[in-house]
């Protein structure tokens, strides 16, 4: 199946555009059939109307998926791209322990409510409406950054509304591993960050050796253990993104990281 996009506004609904969807009428397996494998056969396409960037009540949408499907059918659309938010979270932490002393705000999303449940819902809806083509995906915010300070009443988040659309990924685990800020535990960059993590582990081991002794050495060992543990937690080799929201504008790099990840799937 191949498809191309033709963006247009449709019936006055924000964040919804029509697209031109071209669907091949014969199975993909027939491409390899025939006496001459190199011979190009004519391809028949069927043009259908569709909607892109649809969000449901699974994230911040106003309607559930069944309502959107019924409305789309009434208005002559046959293809729906479902793009709920994969993660909607923001954090601000106090230096030097920004990952420990922090405030987090999060809204419902695919990953906060469960990616498996999200795809099960789309699959069930597709079975109940076989005349419709439902293509799962997400709307994602790979990066944002802070300027100002909450203590000066000028804290500002930048690029929070700079989003990308992901379409066609159907494995829930792929969404759990998206390289975006605040997406939870990830081993994607663990090897890359392991060298610095080893330093903290060595310090903790040194602290344990000193803590086993008596007197001043024991106190020093405990101090080293506590500080090395806090630094390891703050460093977090299992973070979901190589970037953070405190180092200023990172240009296109966080977005390219996400694009490369999706292209590899």
Question: Model-found features: residue ranges?
Answer:
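Gram-negative bacterial Sec-dependent N-terminal signal peptides
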Residues: 1-5
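Extended, charged catalytic domains and RNA/DNA-binding interfaces, predominantly
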Residues: 6-265
